[in-house]
């Protein structure tokens, strides 16, 4: 359909920009510093793609392409997180899964839209949750 073509085009553009924005090597000297960098990059990218992801969400249930697009993005985000974390955290399944959830687009979008937090407030909330989880 025309809508599917439109969303496919939009989705590919978002994915390209998203991956470019997150694929630069992380420069932090410790895994904690690299994790902070990763969080910063995600937040910057999430803020950019939010209007598109919200529009896409309304149509996703009717589009296999958009469903697979979401899965691809989540897999990519998860793999980036795995590369940053030490084995002790990767092996702790519940901590890793909670961290993956906290740093997802869905968490960011809920903080921004449903809980009406500013970008700075949402960032602080996520950083505090991550710090508490990793303490």
Regions found by a protein language model. Name each.
Residues 36-40, 44-57, 62-97, 124-134:
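Amphipathic alpha-helical packing segments from all-alpha helical-bundle domains
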Residues 8, 58, 113:
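Phosphate-coordinating loops and pocket residues in cytosolic domains that bind phosphorylated ligands
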Residues 25, 87-88, 109, 114:
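Alpha-helix C-capping/helix-to-loop hinge sites
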Residues 9, 97, 120-121:
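Short, solvent-exposed positions on alpha-helices
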Residues 96-117, 132-135:
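Amphipathic C-terminal alpha-helical segment
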Residues 5-38:
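Amphipathic alpha-helical linker/stalk segments
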Residues 10-21, 49, 53, 80, ...:
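A short secondary-structure junction motif
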